[in-house]
Amino acid sequence: MDQQSTRTDITVNVDGFWMLQALLDIRHVAPELRCRPYVSTDSNDWLNEHPGMAVMREQGIVVGDTVNEQVAARMRVLAAPDLEVVALLSRGKLLYGVVDNEDQPPGSRDIPDNEFRVVLARRGQHWVSAVRVGNDITVDDVSVSDSASIAALVIDGLESIHHADPAAINAVNVPLEEMLEATKSWQESGFNVFSGGDLRRMGISASTVAALGQALSDPAAEVAVYARQYRDDAKGPSASVLSLKDGSGGRIALYQQARTAGSGEAWLAICPATPQLVQVGVKTVLDTLPYGEWKTHSRV
């Protein structure tokens, strides 16, 4: 990192990130980054002999034996956040971390080749982003003010993989359990548009069934967005997950709606992925976190 430059981000590989963990005594970070856990030892003298230290000193990430304070501050946010917002993005179908490679060694920290992952972490009012692409992780400060700013980051990330216009469909809400059951049998038919009768009976239009079938069977790109809050040593996930899927019929957004008081039924929203509706989906994810207001909640 050139300290004379206006750039503030750093990029290291997984081994370099683990060395930063060792220097700062950080045991682990968000599991989506697929980093190795660090176990404290009596001495870190061995780090000075590691060839990666010379590289990080050249880049200004490490000064002497100490991590650059800006970098250290970001790493501490990643180590003990109040909140994390996670986006898993993929070209093609999202594999959710499953690497289909028989030659992959046990304990591998690889992620699928078609994926990249974004973790937005907040501690106090300090927001940090960590982006993993291949074997590299880029860490930087990030500006987050509301759900719209998070939605914009998600859309920008998806657009960097694949462009799609919002699908030309009408928004619809359907019972979640019924939708999951209907989709399971629909999948067995290869998402054939003529086999979507159960979906049509739920009030989903023929055009929406067609666009949804294209996006589910052969997506050009996907993203899943969810969040976690921390309280002391406990953590709690958002009840809702936002999914964006790019099919030949356009980009579709799906998310579980927040339950209303007194309602025992969960509902799924299916809608065109316009910026406004993506923002609604992100807001729903954040509103379904368990420990209160996402902007101000503190883990302690």
Swiss-Prot record:
A Gene Ontology term for the protein's cellular component: cytoplasm
Keyword Ribosomal protein annotated: no
InterPro entries referenced in this protein's UniProt entry, alphabetically: EspG
Keywords: Chaperone, Cytoplasm
Subcellular location: Cytoplasm
Signal sequence bounds: none
Similarity comment: family membership: Belongs to the EspG family.
Main function: Specific chaperone for cognate PE/PPE proteins. Plays an important role in preventing aggregation of PE/PPE dimers. Required for LipY and PE31/PPE18 secretion.
Quaternary state and interactors: Interacts specifically with ESX-5-dependent PE/PPE proteins. Binds PPE33 and PPE18. Does not interact with EsxN. Monomer in solution.
Protein name: ESX-5 secretion-associated protein EspG5
